[in-house]
């Protein structure tokens, strides 16, 4: 009698006893070549399709990220269907397993210490890492300029108005108010990450290990000192998705309206924080309402229609105030990097395939009440964000839901779990963070040098003497940073709509940048050393 591993794949599923290992043994002879063909297509074929002109690296190298993402989704879906999702599922019922309570205060303490250390090293210069862009934008807002209209800003308005509110509330300068807001964002985001993993119902004992792996990978972004790289921006939407598990279960109309209202509020909060996560949340909640609830089809269609109306209103307001402009430009490839076969990208591909297998088997087994499915739906739109500007940091942060869900699933398999966890630790945590430290070491050294040699930093008197050498006003299209860190703010200097050449990526923004320099001949230009490099 033949072993099930020797049976044709379709026969194995008819027996109902095929395990993922059985399917792997029977399919690896064709699946490995299939994966290699898929990789070749994803990494090469997009070079044959032209993309819209921009200053993005992808355009310079002739790589079309949109085609690459479409090919990834196609080969993932086809591979899942051909393997029947490797029968990746569990018959164990969902259950609540709490994280150890001591992990939260320890996590908060480490975040506080990390933020305090970075502030002690570089906070006084009000412009280290990612923070100079944000502090400069907050300063323009404080001058009465309107964000998104008078000056460009690529994140949600909460990252501008939060620090400014602290500036008006407390006796702190704009720079210090920003760093306080950054620290509070990291702390609050850590709480959301902890609660998200703690509250999700899943039959695994590995939740503490998964929390540690996600937490430490995100902790090292403190070296960037940017509110755009904190747990609040990326863990908050996951927590709200987990909260969706209690929604759309009651068919009574007042309860449906309440659930719609709650989702609209959640979506609006995410627009204020990070608009692309609001889009992903809207997609996730719609899929949950349509596919994961046992209500009558008429009621599910009603919920979906009301969600479209509610989200449409939220996004219409955001569009009116130009909050979505940067997201739409980025979606067109304005800041893309080519998708290359680096270790973080490959591990991310594997995590996407694992999640797709689980989603497929969930529908096959009709186990659509799985609390993790909301994370999977959320992760689908976030693929575009992760594989647009696809450096390791963007892959990790935008792929946070994918990594979280895939770690949960792999923790159920004794042999696969340590292999997958090791791959994650090496190529999503250690390798990217080591390179991150390498990139920021020169800035850290510069900050330490100015600490030891304060006379090397231009004094206020010298800067004012420089500015008074010209009787008129100035234009500083590339910023004015006498100490090499934060921009020196002066009402006599016009900095333009864009910060330096950040996000000056599409023909329209390039033309606007050139007009700022050429249409005011009465103003003197402040240029950095070697301006021809720009």
Annotate each PLM feature.
Residues 1-2, 6-39, 62-118:
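Start-transfer (signal-anchor) and selected internal transmembrane alpha helices
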Residues 23, 28, 257-261, 286, ...:
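Signature aromatic-anchored transmembrane alpha helix within multi-pass, membrane-resident enzymes
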Residues 42-47, 114-160, 172-184, 219-229, ...:
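Transmembrane catalytic cores of multi-pass membrane glycosyltransferases
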Residues 51, 55-74, 156, 181-182, ...:
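Membrane-interface micro-motifs in multi-pass membrane enzymes
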Residues 64-71, 236-239, 279-280, 388-421:
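Hydrophobic/aromatic-rich transmembrane helices and adjacent perimembrane loops
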Residues 153-154, 455-534:
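Short periplasmic/luminal acceptor-recognition loop of GT-C membrane glycosyltransferases, typified by
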Residues 180-203, 236:
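Transmembrane-helix motifs of polytopic, lipid-linked glycan transferases
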Residues 208-212, 237-268, 297-306, 369-378, ...:
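Short hydrophobic alpha-helices at membrane interfaces in multi-pass membrane enzymes
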